[in-house]
Amino acid sequence: MPIGVPKVPYRSPGDKHPSWVDIYNRLYRERLLFLGQMVESDISNQLIGIMVYLSIENETKDLYLFINSPGGWVIPGIAIYDTMQFVRPDVQTICMGLAASMGSFLLAAGASTKRLAFPHARVMIHQPIGAFYGAQTGEFILDTEELLRLREILTMVYVQRSGKPLWVVSEDMERDTFMSATEAQAHGLVDLVAVG
């Protein structure tokens, strides 16, 4: 039996009695954001809107982005990345479960010294993948050029955020490279591994 999104009591400032709100809205009020699905346009726009709103509300208090994502689309992910860099508050990133593909990109995008992985988390990086099936030759070439541009963007961000040389990051992106939390820390994708 589906229960929907759990509801929790929340008292707005100035209210005498709490009202019931869905748990995510309550957590957003505490500046806790969640990426627990594939990265695509809807979740990207939702996270961007919440980050912008909360940064307008208080530009000095950190935001916390919890990530458990198998990855997803590159452009919506880059939009989240750009917003994380644009908003004034630091965005702390926390990997719980899996941060793969675009999930690992966003994990690495957190504020320097404020990127954390839970002890049993897994992180995976790889090169962006295109959807060329059924494409005409001309479309295929244009898609390939765009894919190469996107790969260059992702690679350079990983280099900047990890502190690793270009050749190391490029080599790791050639295939699916899975890492434990401590390996991700050694690779420069997170700064801390939580102690259980």
Swiss-Prot record:
Alphabetized CDD domains for the sequence: S14_ClpP_2 (cd07017)
Predominant subcellular localization, coarse grouping: plastid
The reaction(s) this protein catalyses: Hydrolysis of proteins to small peptides in the presence of ATP and magnesium. alpha-casein is the usual test substrate. In the absence of ATP, only oligopeptides shorter than five residues are hydrolyzed (such as succinyl-Leu-Tyr-|-NHMec, and Leu-Tyr-Leu-|-Tyr-Trp, in which cleavage of the -Tyr-|-Leu- and -Tyr-|-Trp bonds also occurs)
GO biological process, one term: proteolysis
Documented EC number(s): 3.4.21.92
Residues annotated as the enzyme's active site: 101, 126
Family: Belongs to the peptidase S14 family.
Record-given protein name: ATP-dependent Clp protease proteolytic subunit
Gene it is expressed from: clpP
